[in-house]
Amino acid sequence: MDSRTKALCDFLNAAHSVYHAQAYLAETLKNAGYTRLYEQDEWALAPGGKYFLTRGGSALVAFRVPQGSPKGFLMSASHSDRPTFKVKENFELAAAYTRMAVERYGGMLISPWLDRPLSVAGRVTVETEAGVETKLLDIDRDLLLIPNVAIHMNRQANEGYKWNPAVDTLPLVGGAGAAGKLPALLEKEAGGKILGHDLYLYIRQKASVWGVDEEYISSAALDDLECAWSCTQGFLKGGDSASIPVLCVFDSEEVGSVSPQGAGSSLLEDTLGRICDGLKLNRGRMLAQSFLVSADNAHAVHPNHPEYADPGNAPVMGGGLVIKYNANLSYCTDSVSAAVFRKICGRAGVKVQTYHNRADLPGGSTLGRISLAHVSVPTVDIGLAQLAMHSCYETAAVSDAIDLETATAAYYGSTLEATESGFSIL
């Protein structure tokens, strides 16, 4: 297995929640020599400095300051959350069996969650003498399972059965004697009295590289941890640029991005403003020279159902990076931003392909459109082609993740200068 693919798998296998994903990326940046900043502190930025900050335990922004006078911001945005089940505040349901009360987070495919080992991960807030403290928590063993109903009892199971999340998707914890044991286990793992929690279910199956040529990768949360990791690696490997490279990994994309740590928040806008203030730069002039790559996975043409794809814009796994288009601006790509990205990919030797929704199958929106309300710069929406988006176990091509790392390294090593009719790419 290629070392870059192994590193991606290691990340996927550790990122059992949005909080664990952020912590892993923060540690990766710290190990690469980046200094952590805190929003409540004064910032002392210096030429050649490498910095990162987090918000809400689940979003991250990193940036580098060039030695010379900066010409603008080169930004990428991805997200670290995934559709899953969130554990309710009072979660124990005790009767003949002990079950867990959960609710859906995001728009998921429900059926793949059933009949497979699950556990819980996220963060808990525990009581301390001075106040409260937030800790990561991951019960790293097979703990729960959502059982299916036998075909003998549900004859419609294979005929378009409609799931009721209040009934069908409650995880089994144990028998009647298990009542009270899971809350006690969580407090034991947390090391104190839990006053609040943000806990989510995750599947126990590890990331897998497979296929006759080992060309595919399957894992939980490829949408969008695959882009988050590849953009981070490209950011770290990018060469010197006269622009300021900025890496953004947001939370809450799967539920509309409206949170203090989502793309719809002030996080990116606040960070860019503080960079400009700290370096005595004109914010308007900097944004006029800036560019954003919004990286969120795309639908590959399905091998069994090609009819769901637009005939002329149907990306395949392993076919290169996907540029996403939409006439109603669900994606922010236009002719200029697409051309800039194509040019950078061409220089890096990376293939690109295109995606449009089929005209009668409208799709969703993503990070770029939402962040533009706060930071209005030319934006290209891209992604990696994948199958089974929003399943708990998704599939993509190994080569595409490597291509995104290569392309973002080339992007972050470039300098973009706005011209009267386009961009100069140095």
Residue ranges and their predicted role:
Residues 1-426:
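N-terminal hydrophobic/helix-forming segments and targeting peptides
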